[in-house]
Amino acid sequence: MATIEEIAHQIIDQQMGEIVTEQQTGQKIQIVTALDHSTQGKQFILANHEGSTPGKVFLTTPDAAGVNQLFFTSPDLSAPHLQLLTEKSPDQGPNKVFDLCVVCGDKASGRHYGAITCEGCKGFFKRSIRKNLVYSCRGSKDCVINKHHRNRCQYCRLQRCIAFGMKQDSVQCERKPIEVSREKSSNCAASTEKIYIRKDLRSPLAATPTFVTDSETARSAGLLDSGMFVNIHPSGIKTEPAMLMAPDKAESCQGDLSTLASVVTSLANLGKAKDLSHCGGDMPVVQSLRNGDTSFGAFHHDIQTNGDVSRAFDTLAKALTPGESSACQSPEEGMEGSPHLIAGEPSFVEKEGPLLSESHVAFRLTMPSPMPEYLNVHYIGESASRLLFLSMHWALSIPSFQALGQENSISLVKAYWNELFTLGLAQCWQVMNVATILATFVNCLHSSLQQDKMSPERRKSLMEHIFKLQEFCNSMVKLCIDGHEYAYLKAIVLFSPDHPGLENMELIERFQEKAYVEFQDYITRTYPDDTYRLSRLLLRLPALRLMNATITEELFFKGLIGNVRIDSVIPHILKMEPADYNSQIIGHSL
């Protein structure tokens, strides 16, 4: 870092200087001096002055007749700072004050979203966060960002904004018109201040949690030693965005950060309207949602005929639908030769041919972007909701699943959504950064222990569930399971006939047997030397039944949708037309 004296010499000799600050490592800011042209050719001397400090430099002419100027910087300032003093200014006070933008070095207009920035960087950051824009860098993600080149790489500019303290949570949602209802918008449906144990995850978290009992301490120590739980800190988080989104898909995968919350909010608003028009009737729809009751009767019929359900999922479509259509098959291709039965038909048709095709192998998850500096409940809940929706879309893309009829399809997904979701966590382990999410849960439980906000029994059940999740995902990752194997494992789980209340259980059992036969054939052809691979994979499925669906909801979804049960949302998703899903299963390839 150049000294003040060196900077002064550069300013005098060249009328142009360069300042390199600690806050802007590798970033150069050009300062054009305010010297009067009439003073050119005169000799300036670095003069000592009473009260001068190492941070001050006085410039004067030999005859002391020139314009005295003082350039100084202060190490306690959060941004580069430049002041000019002249003899003409009253009481030798500062007549010009410059605060430099920490992002690009332009003249700052104040503190915006937690950092001193110019109006340009302020507006750029606000637009990027409000619209959830995703950028990609054409270089090596270390582009120079300054006043003249700040618009060349939006990715590096946004990363620089976040790195220098601009807070995404400080950006408010766009305000609605006055005539619109004052209820929170979908983007505000899940506040970052409301998390499942009421702790703000934006603050740095402790590296190693401690626990009450010795047994819990031993288990947690082994968990951390395995390397699956990582410390939560800014540098660890910031190195990951490149793997969350492929650069060529980045621009086409933009969407709101509250898909599940938007669906629940839309359904709740529809329910309120229905309740107002039928006052004094049965249980309100909103209460039915919270209780998990899905027998809405006429309500379902009305909102489906009016197309309101489809509009309720507009946000989901934006989040999952890209501009490219080549990455997935067209609805006509996917449904060719497959039966489509209306709910309530007495007959069931078994589809000929294989249960799963190559189109069912792809399982592409689009993560919310940009990734926050510290994980919060909104980001975790949104990531989990996208995985849940994608799992349901995958099930609906199977013709044999549609052949079961609407009621059986709903019953199967309601019974086994937790198992499908857990398999999805293992499959998307790296893309979702599940190890960091689980470590966040552990740290939050540790904090609740210190603050005595949770009963020991509840804390123990949550911790055991987290350990089961970690152990299951860890074992699946070690087996190096490919996309075909995950697809067959999900099909075997989905077509389980042992759930009470299912109709035509014989057909469901035949579908499961068909999935097993195709799975066995694939393993034999692909891994001929691994005799026990099929057995090892199938033996992982019983562990899925140990996962408590209620605890999964509390960990991953409660902060986003409150007390609304996943069971109550599933029927609305599955009653959409199958063709609507084929164009939405798209994103970052695993």
UniProtKB/Swiss-Prot annotation:
Impact after mutating S185A: No effect on sumoylation and little effect on binding KAT2B. Some reduced DNA-binding. Greatly reduced DNA-binding, binding to KAT2B and activation of the RARB promoter
Effect of I145M: In strain: CD-1
Post-translational modification: Sumoylation requires both PIAS1 and UBE2I. Sumoylation appears to dissociate NR2C1 from the PML nuclear bodies. Enhances the interaction with NRIP1 but inhibits interaction with KAT2B. In proliferating cells, stimulation by all-trans retinoic acid, activation of MAPK1-mediated phosphorylation and recruitment to PML bodies with subsequent sumoylation, suppresses OCT4 expression. Phosphorylated on several serine and threonine residues. Phosphorylation on Thr-210, stimulated by all-trans retinoic acid (atRA) mediates PML location and sumoylation in proliferating cells which then modulates its association with effector molecules, KAT2B and NRIP1. Phosphorylation on Ser-568 by PKC is important for protein stability and function as activator of RARB.
Xref: InterPro entries: NHR-like_dom_sf (IPR035500), NR2C1/2-like_DBD (IPR048245), NR2C1/2-like_LBD (IPR048246), Nucl_hrmn_rcpt_lig-bd (IPR000536), Nuclear_hormone_rcpt_NR2 (IPR050274), Nuclear_hrmn_rcpt (IPR001723), Znf_hrmn_rcpt (IPR001628), Znf_NHR/GATA (IPR013088)
Modified residues (Phosphoserine): S185, S203, S461, S568
Gene Ontology MF annotations: DNA binding; DNA-binding transcription repressor activity, RNA polymerase II-specific; histone deacetylase binding; protein homodimerization activity; RNA polymerase II cis-regulatory region sequence-specific DNA binding; zinc ion binding
Localization per Swiss-Prot or TrEMBL: Nucleus; Nucleus, PML body
Induction trigger: By ciliary neurotrophic factor (CNTF). Repressed by vitamin A. Induced by retinoic acid.
Family membership noted in the UniProt record: Belongs to the nuclear hormone receptor family. NR2 subfamily.
The protein's name: Nuclear receptor subfamily 2 group C member 1
UniProt source species: Mus musculus (Mouse)
Phylogenetic classification of the source organism: Eukaryota, Metazoa, Chordata, Craniata, Vertebrata
Gene responsible for this protein: Nr2c1
